Each structure stands twice: as C-alpha cells, then as structure tokens.
Amino acid sequence: MIQTESRLEVADNTGAREVMCIKVLGGSKRRYAGIGDVIKVTVKVAAPRGRVKKGEIYNAVVVRTAKGVRRQDGSLVKFDGNAAVLLNAKLEPIGTRIFGPVTRELRTERFMKIVSLAPEVL
C-alpha cells in the first residue's frame, strides 16, 4: 500500500536507488496504490553515472509491496519492502533490466515488458 511521501526502492537499472511517491494516479481522491498501479515519483537517491538524476520526476509502476496482494485462491504474496520500476511518458520501462521478483498481477497488456525482463514471476 503506497501513498504520498512513501519511499520505494527501484527495481531496475536506470541508476535511481530510491524514489518517493508524490501522487497516486487514477482519480483525484485516490489515496493508496498497490501492485500494478501507476504512481508519480521523484528520484531521491541516484547512482553517480546513472540514466536518471536526483530530483527528476517520472511515472513508475509498483512491482512489490510489503502489504502484499491477495490472490483469488486465498493465498497472499508479500515482500520485504516496497519497489517500483521507472516508466517513461508512454508507460514503457526506462531500464533494460529488472532486479528481484515481480508478481503475476503485472501480466497485463501494459506491463508485459516488465514481466518478460524479470528474473522471477511469483
């Protein structure tokens, strides 16, 4: 469950290490984002020679949450922390590699590229 001011680690190779959510997209009253939701983020910690710089604003998709996601069969998939993948304006991933597992809930038309790049899909 991600809300405004939440800090997330970055699960790709764009050079960003940590981002902060500044807006949950999808309606003016929408407060929380879960796995598969698009949020607006700002880069808080970046690698020295990365593709992105500190202070820049991007779209991102949430790929892991500590809150987890409930499946239809009743199982619950949780992670140790919150993570996101940075996206460009067309909602395509900026990075070329994804680190760590992602969930099957991302297997939609919009985020198939992220699922195919991920080393493990839970």
UniProtKB/Swiss-Prot annotation:
UniProt GO cellular component terms: cytosolic large ribosomal subunit
BP GO annotations: translation
Keyword DNA repair: no
Keywords: Ribonucleoprotein, Ribosomal protein, RNA-binding, rRNA-binding
A GO molecular-function annotation: large ribosomal subunit rRNA binding
Keyword Manganese attributed: no
PROSITE patterns: RIBOSOMAL_L14
UniProt cross-references to Pfam families, sorted A to Z: Ribosomal_L14
Record-stated family: Belongs to the universal ribosomal protein uL14 family.
Protein function: Binds to 23S rRNA. Forms part of two intersubunit bridges in the 70S ribosome.
Subunit-level organization: Part of the 50S ribosomal subunit. Forms a cluster with proteins L3 and L19. In the 70S ribosome, L14 and L19 interact and together make contacts with the 16S rRNA in bridges B5 and B8.
Protein name: Large ribosomal subunit protein uL14
Lineage: Bacteria, Pseudomonadati, Pseudomonadota, Betaproteobacteria, Burkholderiales
Gene this protein is translated from: rplN
